[in-house]
């Protein structure tokens, strides 16, 4: 379902990862997609990595019960290294499990990344 005037009032922001500095691998909290329909757009915004040979891999995982998560097929951003990066990817809320979360893997020597991941989705009911 696309975004148009008729459904803009149903557009909702989803926080995958709030803006913060990350120095080690981790993940966000589960996001309940039960009240959403269609595609969910996720936006990664990352400053250039710090440290020596920094790498950042960000993926979306899903879970049926919000406790055991696994990688969602095709839901990986392009690796971020020494340059700032803004990227987007979409997932279908109809084709994944009820909960999703953002997972990030950081590598390198003393790596740091300032980043955020925000989602945009349409609520089923306005």
Task: Pin down the residues of each PLM region.
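Beta-strand signatures of extracellular beta-sandwich domains
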Residues: 57-61
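Noncatalytic modules at the cell exterior or secretory-pathway interfaces
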Residues: 38-42, 93-113
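Short loop/turn segments immediately following beta-strands, especially the blade-tip
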Residues: 62-67
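Solvent-exposed, flexible loop/coil segments flanking beta-strands in beta-rich domains
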Residues: 1-35
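Exposed aromatic-hydrophobic patches
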Residues: 29-31, 85-93
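C-terminal interaction-tip segments
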Residues: 1-15, 106-126
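Solvent-exposed serine/threonine-rich low-complexity stretches and specific carbohydrate-binding patches
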Residues: 71-81
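Extended, low-complexity, turn-rich repeat/linker tracts enriched in Gly/Pro/Ser/Thr and Asp/Glu
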Residues: 47-55, 108-112
């Amino acid at each position: 379902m696309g975004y148009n005037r008729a459904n803009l009032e149903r557009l909702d922001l989803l926080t995958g990862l709030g803006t913060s500095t990350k120095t080690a691998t981790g993940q966000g909290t589960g996001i309940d997609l039960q009240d959403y329909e269609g595609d969910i757009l996720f936006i990664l915004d990352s400053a250039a990595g710090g440290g020596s040979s920094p790498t950042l891999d960000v993926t979306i995982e899903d879970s049926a019960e919000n406790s055991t998560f696994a990688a969602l097929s095709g839901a990986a951003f392009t690796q971020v290294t020494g340059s700032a990066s803004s990227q987007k990817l979409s997932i279908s809320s109809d084709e994944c499990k009820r909960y999703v979360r953002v997972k990030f893997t950081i590598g390198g020597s003393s790596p740091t990344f300032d980043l955020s991941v925000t989602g945009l989705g349409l609520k089923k009911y306005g």
